[in-house]
């Protein structure tokens, strides 16, 4: 067999020509020590603060402490498989998450990975979880309502789109119930074909809660048809502290996608006390100096940089908004503890829930005296302003008088009248769970209350009166509700029509 050298060299040259060798250079370090969800790593000299790193077994971590001789890394997962001497490599990416409409209807973990068993997320875009809040120029003052569907809140402590309203109270006072009702109340706005400017997408971040609680929450959303316009981010009690720390930022980035694209979203952080506890744990293990109540010095900055990202943007920036409803759990009604005072000072008002009111049957258990909205009536429709202005004054007088009435038995007629009216208005503001009311329905109910149509009734009959009046208006007199809804105002003409309907109903009811 004749082998020609020229042929062989031609074949070899041809093969060598197509042989491209690309060396991939990655910066790696070595684990010095690991334990309690923290790894100390030597050798990652150029790592950035907040950068994702990857351990040998695929577990991810985040570089938080950049020291002279080592890097403190918090681990997003179990640290059992990580051993001293193993290599750690940089990913050159700051922690990010998928964003977009593909996340709606899904339950994800603190890094945006699906945990609901419905397959991969249909999302192409990724965004960093910890970004700067919008500056002063892109913002606009809050001017449109974000209806919760709860009379006690929409009338007395109105929340606007782009506002940050704290929900604060002891355990088991109905904080999550208010958040859930707010999500359910957005269902009529999120119907197919509704304009984007009207829709309000919901993001719910569960931090440090039991898995059974989160599962129950998702089940209710599904049953009520509210999951399709909601995203649930869950970092449960059994997840590592770094996951509970990062979850609110992940949820916020998902909400910001809507805000920055001219849409509207509301995000609920349930709850930030547990995030602060997780952050305290991480900080102490990273040997950062402790401050008051052993929290690190920058725990205020932790919450302020998160809540400042909720904003109403002006027309030049798309008019989008992100409303934040952070939840804080107090211990024995102590609002003056460290974390509650911090978050109260950052937010634009608070809804204060009380155990005593809850057990008296006043639910939602809102303490109207201590709750405020610093945005106020600019977050209300004209119709609601007209009827709610009176109810605020009457309830304030009622609280004052009720305190005095405990001492004296012989009260003059006007005081007695005020106490009667107050007790009926308090009864009127009660509302069962999962039954949010539309704005126009709240207006007619409160109109009946402040104009004295409930005064002759016994307190026990107030609920029946309200239900009957609403069913009458939803049936025969639906045009009154439609007029209030479309004009967002209670004109003299509509008020006259409403007055005759309410008077007629009051006579038949008695």
From Swiss-Prot:
<comment type="function">
    <text>Produces ATP from ADP in the presence of a proton gradient across the membrane. The alpha chain is a regulatory subunit.</text>
</comment>
<dbReference type="GO" id="GO:0046933">
    <property type="term" value="F:proton-transporting ATP synthase activity, rotational mechanism"/>
</dbReference>
<dbReference type="Pfam" id="PF00306">
    <property type="entry name" value="ATP-synt_ab_C"/>
</dbReference>
<dbReference type="GO" id="GO:0005886">
    <property type="term" value="C:plasma membrane"/>
</dbReference>
<dbReference type="InterPro" id="IPR020003">
    <property type="entry name" value="ATPase_a/bsu_AS"/>
</dbReference>
<keyword id="KW-0406">Ion transport</keyword>
<feature type="site" description="Required for activity">
    <location>
        <position position="371"/>
    </location>
</feature>
<keyword id="KW-0997">Cell inner membrane</keyword>
<dbReference type="InterPro" id="IPR004100">
    <property type="entry name" value="ATPase_F1/V1/A1_a/bsu_N"/>
</dbReference>
<dbReference type="Pfam" id="PF00006">
    <property type="entry name" value="ATP-synt_ab"/>
</dbReference>
<dbReference type="InterPro" id="IPR000793">
    <property type="entry name" value="ATP_synth_asu_C"/>
</dbReference>
<keyword id="KW-0067">ATP-binding</keyword>
<comment type="similarity">
    <text>Belongs to the ATPase alpha/beta chains family.</text>
</comment>
<dbReference type="GO" id="GO:0045259">
    <property type="term" value="C:proton-transporting ATP synthase complex"/>
</dbReference>
<keyword id="KW-0472">Membrane</keyword>
<dbReference type="GO" id="GO:0005524">
    <property type="term" value="F:ATP binding"/>
</dbReference>
<dbReference type="InterPro" id="IPR005294">
    <property type="entry name" value="ATP_synth_F1_asu"/>
</dbReference>
<protein>
    <recommendedName>
        <fullName>ATP synthase subunit alpha</fullName>
        <ecNumber>7.1.2.2</ecNumber>
    </recommendedName>
</protein>
<keyword id="KW-0375">Hydrogen ion transport</keyword>
<keyword id="KW-1278">Translocase</keyword>
<dbReference type="InterPro" id="IPR027417">
    <property type="entry name" value="P-loop_NTPase"/>
</dbReference>
<dbReference type="GO" id="GO:0043531">
    <property type="term" value="F:ADP binding"/>
</dbReference>
<comment type="subunit">
    <text>F-type ATPases have 2 components, CF(1) - the catalytic core - and CF(0) - the membrane proton channel. CF(1) has five subunits: alpha(3), beta(3), gamma(1), delta(1), epsilon(1). CF(0) has four main subunits: a(1), b(1), b'(1) and c(9-12).</text>
</comment>
<keyword id="KW-0813">Transport</keyword>
<keyword id="KW-0139">CF(1)</keyword>
<dbReference type="Pfam" id="PF02874">
    <property type="entry name" value="ATP-synt_ab_N"/>
</dbReference>
<dbReference type="InterPro" id="IPR023366">
    <property type="entry name" value="ATP_synth_asu-like_sf"/>
</dbReference>
<feature type="binding site">
    <location>
        <begin position="169"/>
        <end position="176"/>
    </location>
    <ligand>
        <name>ATP</name>
    </ligand>
</feature>
<keyword id="KW-1003">Cell membrane</keyword>
<keyword id="KW-0547">Nucleotide-binding</keyword>
<dbReference type="InterPro" id="IPR036121">
    <property type="entry name" value="ATPase_F1/V1/A1_a/bsu_N_sf"/>
</dbReference>
<dbReference type="InterPro" id="IPR000194">
    <property type="entry name" value="ATPase_F1/V1/A1_a/bsu_nucl-bd"/>
</dbReference>
<dbReference type="InterPro" id="IPR033732">
    <property type="entry name" value="ATP_synth_F1_a_nt-bd_dom"/>
</dbReference>
<dbReference type="InterPro" id="IPR038376">
    <property type="entry name" value="ATP_synth_asu_C_sf"/>
</dbReference>
<keyword id="KW-0066">ATP synthesis</keyword>
């Amino acid at each position: 067999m004749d082998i020609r050298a020229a042929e062989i060299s031609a074949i070899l040259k041809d093969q060598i020509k197509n042989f491209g060798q690309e060396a991939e250079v990655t910066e790696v370090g070595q684990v010095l020590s690991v334990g309690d969800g923290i790894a100390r790593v030597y050798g990652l000299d150029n790592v950035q603060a907040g950068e994702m790193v990857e351990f040998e077994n695929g577990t991810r971590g985040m570089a938080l402490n950049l020291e002279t001789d080592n890097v403190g890394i918090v681990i997003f997962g179990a640290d059992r498989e990580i051993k001293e001497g193993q290599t750690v490599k940089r990913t050159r990416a700051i922690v990010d998450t998928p964003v977009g409409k593909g996340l709606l209807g899904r339950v994800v973990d603190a890094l945006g990975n699906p945990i609901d068993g419905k397959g991969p997320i249909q999302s192409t875009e990724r965004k960093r979880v910890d970004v700067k809040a919008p500056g002063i120029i892109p913002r606009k003052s809050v001017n449109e309502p974000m209806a919760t569907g709860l009379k006690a809140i929409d009338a007395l402590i109105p929340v606007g789109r782009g506002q940050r309203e704290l929900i604060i109270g002891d355990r088991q006072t109905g904080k999550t119930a208010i958040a859930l009702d707010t999500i359910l109340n957005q269902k009529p706005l999120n119907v197919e074909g509704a304009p984007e400017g009207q829709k309000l997408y919901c993001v719910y971040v569960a931090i440090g809660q039991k898995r059974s609680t989160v599962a129950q929450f998702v089940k209710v959303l599904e049953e009520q048809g509210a999951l399709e316009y909601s995203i649930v981010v869950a970092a449960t009690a059994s997840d590592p502290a770094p996951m509970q720390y990062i979850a609110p930022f992940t949820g916020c980035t998902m909400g910001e996608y809507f805000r920055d694209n001219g849409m509207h979203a509301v995000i609920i952080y349930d709850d930030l006390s547990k995030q602060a506890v997780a952050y305290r744990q991480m900080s102490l293990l990273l040997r950062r100096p402790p401050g008051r109540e052993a929290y690190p010095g920058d725990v205020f900055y932790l919450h302020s940089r998160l809540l400042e990202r909720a904003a109403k943007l002006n027309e030049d920036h798309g008019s989008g908004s992100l409303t934040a409803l952070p939840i804080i759990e107090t211990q024995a009604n102590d609002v003056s503890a460290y974390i509650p005072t911090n978050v109260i000072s950052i937010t634009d008002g608070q809804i204060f829930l009380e155990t005593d009111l809850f057990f008296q049957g006043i639910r939602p258990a809102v303490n109207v005296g201590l709750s405020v909205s610093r945005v106020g009536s600019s977050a209300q429709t004209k119709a609601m302003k007209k009827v709610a202005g009176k109810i605020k004054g009457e309830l304030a007088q009622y609280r004052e008088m009720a305190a005095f009435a405990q001492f004296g038995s012989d009260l003059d007629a006007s005081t007695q009248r005020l106490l009667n009216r107050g007790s009926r208005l308090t009864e009127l503001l009660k509302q069962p769970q999962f039954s949010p009311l539309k704005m126009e329905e709240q207006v007619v109910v409160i109109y009946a209350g402040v104009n004295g149509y409930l005064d002759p009734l016994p307190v026990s009959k107030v609920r029946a009166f309200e239900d009957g009046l609403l069913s009458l208006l939803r049936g025969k007199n639906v045009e009154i509700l439609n007029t209030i809804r479309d004009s967002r105002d209670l004109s003299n003409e509509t008020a006259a029509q409403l007055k005759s309907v309410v008077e007629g109903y009051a006579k038949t009811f008695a």
